[in-house]
């Protein structure tokens, strides 16, 4: 009986993992579809919204049917196994027992599904909402400088990846890992320049030395999001100014004391419906084409 239950949990976990993978792949596909449709093409944008909703509905139905089929098959296998070993046991009117582990997995899967649905809803809403307006403003600001946004993945490393991308244009090959490590080292060796600006979110008090040390360790060892302090450290490390372009505020330049050509990042408050995000920039495609013709 224990072997049957273990196999049941293994099969369900594998199915739920595949479902999560398929959902992530669908979100990536949807993002690609959105990027392929011009922002000012309202007719195609409307059709895109309908297509996205259809794709998500079809996947949700497919996953529900697969999960129901697995549970049905598992139930039948369990009954067959018990019948072989305990021939005199009457199974009628005895509902299948659900283990605590299975309940936890189902609850976790339900929460994950709810989260992904909220993200998908935010994505669709932002086609005409704050994200769309922010993107339009940034596109105009950058176009005036013959630039456009270069998308960077939203994975916690976006600021460092945007810096990495900008450095490639200068033939400087520093990876995200190296940038994070050097940032933490610089901040640890210049504590007085950074500690006063960090406060405990629960108490409002300035970080203790131990909390500051943990903050620096997280820069190296986790996907901790980088902000103004990390940009300040990077400008000193690279001895290069860093310009941050925003939709509703003037550009911010960190490291103005340096004379090199600045690295340019785009700061977005409403990216992906998930909060703040950094992107890189590149030259406008049509400008590059004209120069090469």
UniProtKB/Swiss-Prot annotation:
The active site is at 155, 158 (nucleophile), 277. The modification N-acetylmethionine is found at residue 1. Residues 152-158 are annotated as: Cys-loop. Pfam families: OTU. Keywords: Acetylation, Disease variant, Epilepsy, Hydrolase, Intellectual disability, Protease, Thiol protease, Ubl conjugation pathway. Its EC number is 3.4.19.12. Residues 267-277 are annotated as: His-loop. One of its GO terms (molecular function) is cysteine-type deubiquitinase activity. It is linked to Intellectual developmental disorder with dysmorphic facies, seizures, and distal limb anomalies: An autosomal recessive severe multisystem disorder characterized by poor overall growth, developmental delay, early-onset seizures, intellectual disability, and dysmorphic features. Additional features include microcephaly, absent speech, hypotonia, feeding difficulties, structural brain abnormalities, congenital malformations including congenital heart disease, and musculoskeletal features. Interacts with the eukaryotic translation initiation factor 4F complex. This is Deubiquitinase OTUD6B.
